[in-house]
Swiss-Prot record:
Subcellular compartments: Cytoplasm
Family recorded in the similarity comment: Belongs to the RuvB family.
Lineage: Bacteria, Bacillati, Actinomycetota, Actinomycetes, Micrococcales
NCBIfam families associated with the record: PRK00080.1, ruvB
Function statement: The RuvA-RuvB-RuvC complex processes Holliday junction (HJ) DNA during genetic recombination and DNA repair, while the RuvA-RuvB complex plays an important role in the rescue of blocked DNA replication forks via replication fork reversal (RFR). RuvA specifically binds to HJ cruciform DNA, conferring on it an open structure. The RuvB hexamer acts as an ATP-dependent pump, pulling dsDNA into and through the RuvAB complex. RuvB forms 2 homohexamers on either side of HJ DNA bound by 1 or 2 RuvA tetramers; 4 subunits per hexamer contact DNA at a time.
Keyword field contains Hydrolase: yes
Spans traversing the lipid bilayer: none
Amino-acid positions noted as binding DNA in the UniProt annotation, renumbered to this chain: R312, R317
Protein name as annotated: Holliday junction branch migration complex subunit RuvB
UniProt keywords, alphabetically: ATP-binding, Cytoplasm, DNA damage, DNA recombination, DNA repair, DNA-binding, Hydrolase, Nucleotide-binding
Length: 358
């Protein structure tokens, strides 16, 4: 079973109170995502000028980039109450009807992981978003009747890490869609500077750069690493965090200079030392590192692929040339590079089921 990871983009339950204190409260304080911020500001300002609820908003992108924060900012900018729920919590149309029927005029409803809602609830949401009305079915079989229920105008903010799983009719009902992208190191430094100020931490520029460089382009991870470095500095009696102390702290937590953790390095190490760089099937690779295939596929692989360290081909997973270099191995002649992916033809769906060692 995978250990909790410092570099997971997901939010841990114990982090929620701290994260809430560090969240920006308005678009001006929100760092990064310049394109989405600019577009969203225009949508909200126009809505306020018209005196109407804002259009429904869909935020997509990997975990930890600010989708929940933006939902809270939308409610604050519109001076409206915020109702928070999630797709997994809405498994029946009745669950959604109960939420919708209790909304007040202008209220913002935030549905996290909206792609995980049940199909009956999705179909009810279509009418609610478009006509601000739902039909409540009373009775069963031939005697069932639909009672229309009028809803006050509201703004739905949906968040998803897998926009491709949303049905087209649902996507089309959002007036604004914003895709959040990973942050640059410079943007993460700004996030860390703001958080350090709120936490009353003394960190120099080199310290911010060191932490930002290991944060996988994700503000949530950056803030998490900052708190771990703070703990390390407190125990070691260090008043100002610099690059050396930040590096020592994160090395202790096994987060390396590129943001790889123990599981990431184990996957690459197994590919190189046990399978000569691959290709190897997912199930075999998971056995080699002592984890479940789903853990390797969903926790480790996305970042490794994005960093160009691991490739997925129809024949299985391969270690790219940069993976050999990163782990300190000499790159053998003819080892896999980007041209090899082109030769094999990347096929993620097939690669997920293939279990070939050679």
């Amino acid at each position: 079973m995978a250990e909790p990871s410092l570099v997971s983009g997901g939010e841990e339950p114990e982090e929620r109170v701290i994260e809430a204190a560090l969240r920006p409260k308005n678009l001006h304080d929100f760092v990064g995502q310049h394109r989405v911020r600019k577009q969203l500001a225009l949508v909200l300002e126009a809505s306020k000028m018209r005196g109407r609820s804002a259009d429904h908003v869909l935020m997509s992108g990997p975990p930890g980039l600010g989708k929940t924060t933006l939902a809270m900012i939308i409610a604050a900018e519109m001076n409206a109450p915020l109702r928070i729920s999630s797709g997994p919590a809405i498994q029946h149309a009745g669950d959604l009807a109960a939420i919708l029927s209790s909304l007040s005029e202008g209220e913002v409803l935030f549905l996290d992981e909206i792609h995980r809602m049940s199909r009956p609830a999705e179909e009810m949401l279509y009418m609610a978003m478009e006509d601000f009305r739902v039909d409540i079915v009373v009775g069963k079989g031939a005697g069932a009747t639909a009672i229309p229920l009028e809803l006050p105008p509201f703004t739905l903010v949906g968040a998803t890490t897998r926009a491709g799983l949303l049905p087209g009719p649902l996507r089309d009902r959002f007036g604004f869609t914003g895709h959040l992208e990973f942050y640059s190191v410079a943007e993460l430094e700004l996030v860390l500077r703001r958080s350090a100020g709120l936490l009353d931490l003394k960190v120099n520029s080199a310290g911010f750069t060191e932490i930002a460089g290991r944060s996988r382009g994700t503000p949530r991870i950056a803030n998490r690493l900052l708190r771990r470095v703070r703990d390390w500095a407190l125990v070691h009696g260090i008043e100002q965090i610099d690059a050396r102390s930040a590096s020592a702290a994160l090395d202790m937590y096994e987060v390396d200079e590129r943001g790889l953790d123990r599981l990431d390095r184990s996957v690459l190490e197994a590919l190189i030392t046990k399978f000569n760089g691959g290709p190897v099937g997912l199930s075999t690779l998971a056995i080699a590192v002592g984890e479940e295939p789903e853990t390797v596929e969903t926790v480790a692989e996305p970042f490794l692929v994005r960093e160009g360290l691991l490739g997925r081909t129809p024949r299985g997973r391969i270690a790219m040339a940069s993976a050999w270099t990163h782990l300190g191995y000499a790159v053998p002649a003819g080892v896999f590079g980007q041209e090899t992916l082109a030769l094999y033809g990347e096929d993620e769906n097939h690669a997920e089921s293939v279990d070939t060692v050679g």
